[in-house]
Amino acid sequence: VLTPGLLSELDAAIDSVRANPAVKGLLITSGKSSFVAGADISEMKGMDKAKAKEYSLLGHRIFSRMENSPVIFIGAVNGFALGGGLELAMACDIRILAQVAQLGLPEATLGLIPGFGGTQRLQRLIGQSAAKYLSLTADRITSDDALRVGLAAKVVEGEKLITEAEAMAAKILALGPHAAQTLKTVMREGADKSLPDALAYEAEEFSTLFTGSEAHEGLNAFLEKRPAKF
């Protein structure tokens, strides 16, 4: 479950990878039958308004750090990703799901709403209509449904999940590292801009990369028909 302690561990992990320039990606998964099955309800029950808001803002801060980090986060969802578990998965850049995975935001059944960004990230990922349906019914959706609505990038058999996630990470690591980081940043920040402003932003970043050493190596490698050495 997603306790304040687990959130703090995730926060520390983000600190660690950001302090190490050699780390370009981070795979988030669970060794259990659930990815994250939600929050600790017994712990939440004892919170007053101030504590509840503090808990919500902690989740917001950490998940926003994931989104704003140059590191690429891959969520390998191996089972239930409910409530805060789905909110954690949505903060990842890419989600790959085991066939048995189930996703949902059941908070309204507790008289609550998602508190770690679920009301906002879900509609940005799958559209407001589908997000309202998932939230207001509190239904769990299957991995295939998640793939269909764009909440997952790929669905695989459970025993292949980590292998497939690692293969996906290897593809990302083979890219120009600055290019991959810039892709993430331009897509994230461009989503909140008007289309003309976003296109201008893209052109600026494209031209900046174009004159850099990564592009020099990548273009030469292509013309010389050899793998690029970034």
Where are the predicted features?
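Acidic, divalent-metal-coordinating active-site segment for phosphoryl/phosphodiester hydrolysis
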Residues: 138-145
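Short, conserved active-site loops that position catalytic residues or coordinate cofactors/metal ions
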Residues: 29-30, 35-41
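Conserved CoA-thioester-binding segment of acyl-CoA-metabolizing enzymes
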Residues: 1-29, 46, 50, 57, ...
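Glycine-rich phosphate-binding loop at the start of an alpha helix
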Residues: 38, 53-56, 60, 83, ...
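CoA-thioester-processing core
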Residues: 62, 66-68, 76, 82-136, ...
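C-terminal long alpha-helix characteristic of the crotonase
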Residues: 16, 96-101, 143, 152-200, ...
